[in-house]
Amino acid sequence: MTDEMFCFQCQQTAHNEKCNGKAGVCGKKSDTAKAQDELIGALIGLAKAAEYGTPTDSTDRLVLKGLFTTITNVNFNTHTVKELTAEVKDEKRRIYKNHVDDYELSRLWEAGEDIRSLKSLILFGIKGMAAYAYHALALGKTDSEVNAFFYTALRAIEGENDPDKLLRLVLKTGEVNFKCMALLDNANTESYGDPVPTVVPLTIEKGPFIVVSGHDLHDLKLLLEQTEGKGINIYTHSEMLPAHGYPGLKKYKHLKGNFGTGWQNQQSEFHNIPAPILFTTNCIMPVRQSYSDRVFTTSVVSYPELVHIGDDKDFSPVIAKALECGGYDEDKEMTGMNGGHTVMTGFAHNAVLSRADEIVALVKRGKIKHFFLIGGCDGASPSRSYYTDFAKATPPDTLILTLACGKYRINDLDLGTIDGIPRILDCGQCNDAYSAIRIALALADAFGCSVNDLPLTLVLSWYEQKAVCILLTLLYLGIKNILLGPTLPAFISPGVLDVLVKNYNITPTDNPESDLAKALGRK
């Protein structure tokens, strides 16, 4: 290929076509992009070897780590990507002595557009699913069917070119991801208890503190243990916000609140911050000099010249930096994206379904007339104000479920309550789409109908590959009439889009007022 890099896996890809040349819109350099492609090619080689060899638990973990590493805004470090690729190649030779070629990923990018599109859906879907399986594994939970599917899907990237079979594999990816999200839900709740509705302040108290970003609740728990009694407060950031709902985490009195808003605002919000930031997963953006000496990474996250906390999870350097920085001299008042001073979280499936009878009764009495799921990934595009405008325009007799970092567009709005039930219910992280699905399925069961027959509209925002696997799960479940934005994925070809529209009526977001009117059956 003539382009120095080729990447179109995220929503902000250049001109909604592809990133090429010297760097991507996310800040990933071309050499890192090419190294990540080589890593995927090596994983495909490993998957082929596993068909004849003897993969072990360590092989499975390496596959998860490799796929997770290539998710958008996880790894900007060409050196560590190449180290991981070498590890994958060594593992391939360990499990199977005969020679097996790796895959040249440019073959995928140069394939016919429909085949490329279907294989991209599978590849990006298993990247997202690998993140969920990786987090579950950190808590001691794994599933042989889920693990086996990664190998099957990777082999199909090279070896399957029948569009009908690939389409079935796309839906199979959604099916297996549903099982994987259930696995992670079980891992989280067994470890930390079922989330409970919790008010989370956005004000940062004076004194030393640490900001924890990403999704890894296990890393947060370890940091809370290591900082207990040391006069250091802990604040969540972005997708770590739902941690406040878990009893096993909120019991730590120094888990104080949430710092800032969506991940895309971190470069301005972290400017001259008098505290360290720990990234446990995505989304890390190119780090600016005004705070670079205070950023630490762990797990799959890697960025050149930053201090990385290894598998021993000794957070002493982070703790020392917090004490050195000292924090703010006085309490610092921060707000959400709409000016709110607090947000709520903890409305996972157990919390909501414990009030299912009450919700059903409110529907029957006409006090709740429609449900919305407004959530998904956030991002920098100005058009994402659509989601805020949509939520603001919803009538007072409607309930809104939200999740993932897209929640920051709406989670500090005061939309009131319906008989004591907040109109905005934050289900949790992106993987807690599982909770939203469980809630929808339970409501459908209560009303004796399908999810598609409920007064429910899904208004989804996407950015990276975890959103892809969630979308595939919704398609596997047969859920239709999804509004998807702020743009449709560049990797979905017109032919594949036609299939999705015909079978599922996926519709791009347009105008919040007209989309809302259609959802409510108004002209």
Residue spans of the language-model regions?
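Anaerobic metallocofactor- and corrinoid-dependent redox/one-carbon enzyme cores
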Residues: 2-32, 36-38, 44-45, 168, ...
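Electropositive, gly/pro-rich neighborhoods at or near active sites that engage anionic ligands
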Residues: 43-191, 197
